């Protein structure tokens, strides 16, 4: 049924719907919490700037996929795309960071689910934590739910009416404060940037969408433009959500919040938001923890002997148990996990890497895109390397002045080192060497 619903859309409409439904981020529920330290309007400006860069990056990755004949013939995944265009050695660091990002998403989902459902229902958090662990264990033992892309996208899109209803109730309630904070620090700004970066985790899903849509629209125009439009749609949804929640909440209402924005929002606005928020939490974070826990299990299984694959399910469960220990020690927050992960992993994976892939694909790809399927400007080396350099500069700033503590600075330094190593190894492999016949 879901596949038939998407089949009725134009190729462009299919890409946009799949993109928004699959990519709709869990970090959306942490953005208002992070933004409270700087104020909604400065956070909105950061969101607009990051969203613009991510739009270019998503389109760049889409064009790289369009140019990859091996992907069209045999399929593949994001790591194989990186290996194909940048070289096997250059793919090692991005592969490791992708695993870290996925593990961080499992951790954040566990924290968000257990803390938020406890706040919305009054049932103790430890009870929710135990229930989540059991549910995740059962799913992993069954190999996950094996949700097709169309069904997964429909489930993601089903969260939009819940978001809209909660936003409308928040605006109607009022009493919030959207003015900028007067005394925010550089570290608070850094957390907002990190959480905002984690709104854009499309790398894996663009590959999945390409596999679904390129056979029907092989010129690639729908994939490239739909990826850009989908990213803009995610940015617009995040901006509207931030303003709506800020209409009902003051920054002090979110100070020290461990879970998502939904708990404080329900406290301020009443039972209707509690009911809708519980449904949204289960749908958005529940779907997120299923996807990411299965992904972690498969990543670990790939690195174990075949006889020990069954032990791979322990890895995501261990991440959830780590979340429980950190919560008990009052040492972690939902927004904090995404803030660190966004800086340490996504500035490379979602910003720098797609631009590098585009440069390499224009040099070494074996399929020429159809009319309108080329990313304007960003494929020029000067523009692409400027964006890559901006990502490196941001990581350097996080490693020195924008990070909140030693752990965050080390995480940013690791991300910077991974970016430098990836660029160096890709250059050594000749991925960016000029070829006269390529534009």
Language-model region placement:
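TM-loop-TM module centered on a large, flexible mid-protein loop between adjacent transmembrane helices
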Residues: 69-88, 231-286, 306, 328, ...
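Extracellular loop-to-transmembrane helix junctions
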Residues: 32-79, 230, 412-418
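A generic transmembrane alpha-helix motif of multi-pass inner-membrane proteins
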Residues: 333-363, 371-439
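Transmembrane alpha-helical segments of multi-pass small-molecule transport proteins
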Residues: 11-22, 94-99, 119-144, 158-166, ...
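Hydrophobic transmembrane alpha-helices that form the core helical bundles
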Residues: 56-127, 274-304, 351
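Membrane-interface "cap" regions at the ends of multi-pass membrane proteins
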Residues: 1-42, 54-59, 143-146, 193, ...
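Membrane-water interface regions at transmembrane-helix termini and the short interhelical loops
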Residues: 33, 37, 112-119, 133-155, ...
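Helix-loop-helix junctions that connect adjacent transmembrane segments
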Residues: 3-6, 123-132, 146, 150-266
């Amino acid at each position: 049924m879901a596949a038939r619903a998407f089949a009725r859309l134009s190729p462009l409409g299919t890409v946009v719907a799949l993109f928004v439904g699959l990519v709709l981020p869990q970090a959306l529920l942490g953005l208002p919490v992070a933004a409270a330290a700087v104020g909604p309007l400065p956070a909105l400006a950061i969101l607009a700037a990051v969203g613009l860069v991510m739009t270019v990056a998503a389109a760049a990755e889409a064009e790289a996929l369009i140019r990859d004949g091996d992907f069209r013939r045999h399929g593949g995944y994001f790591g194989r795309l990186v290996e194909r265009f940048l070289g096997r050695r250059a793919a090692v660091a991005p592969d490791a960071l992708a695993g870290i990002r996925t593990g961080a998403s499992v951790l954040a989902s566990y924290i968000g689910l257990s803390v938020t459902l406890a706040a919305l229902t009054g049932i103790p958090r430890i009870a929710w934590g135990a229930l989540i662990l059991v549910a995740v264990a059962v799913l992993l033992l069954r190999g996950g739910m094996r949700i097709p892309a169309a069904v997964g996208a429909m489930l993601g899109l089903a969260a939009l009416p819940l978001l809209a209803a909660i936003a409308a109730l928040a605006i109607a309630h009022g009493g919030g404060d959207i003015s900028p904070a007067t005394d925010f620090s550089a570290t608070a700004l850094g957390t907002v940037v990190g959480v905002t970066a984690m709104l854009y985790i499309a790398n894996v899903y663009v590959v999945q969408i390409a596999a679904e849509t390129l056979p029907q629209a092989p010129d690639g125009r729908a994939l490239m433009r739909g990826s850009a439009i989908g990213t803009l749609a995610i940015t617009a949804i995040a901006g509207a959500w931030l303003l709506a929640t800020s209409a009902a909440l003051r920054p002090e209402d979110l100070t020290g919040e461990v879970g998502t924005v939904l708990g404080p929002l329900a406290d301020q606005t009443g039972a209707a938001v509690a009911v809708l928020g519980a449904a949204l939490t289960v749908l958005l974070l529940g779907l997120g923890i299923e996807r990411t826990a299965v992904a972690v299990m498969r990543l670990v299984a790939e690195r174990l002997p075949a006889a020990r694959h069954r032990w791979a399910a322990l890895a995501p469960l261990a991440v959830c148990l780590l979340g429980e220990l950190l919560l008990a020690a009052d040492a972690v927050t939902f927004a904090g996990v995404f803030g660190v992960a966004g800086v340490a992993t996504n500035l490379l994976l979602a910003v720098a890497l797609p631009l590098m892939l585009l440069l390499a694909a224009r040099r070494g790809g074996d399929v020429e895109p159809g009319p309108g399927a080329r990313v304007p400007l960003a494929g020029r080396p000067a523009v692409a390397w400027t964006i890559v350099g901006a990502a490196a500069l941001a990581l350097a700033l996080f490693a020195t002045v924008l990070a909140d503590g030693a752990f965050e600075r080390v995480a940013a330094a690791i991300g910077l080192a991974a970016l430098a190593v990836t660029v160096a190894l890709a250059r050594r492999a000749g991925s960016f060497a000029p070829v006269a016949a390529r534009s």
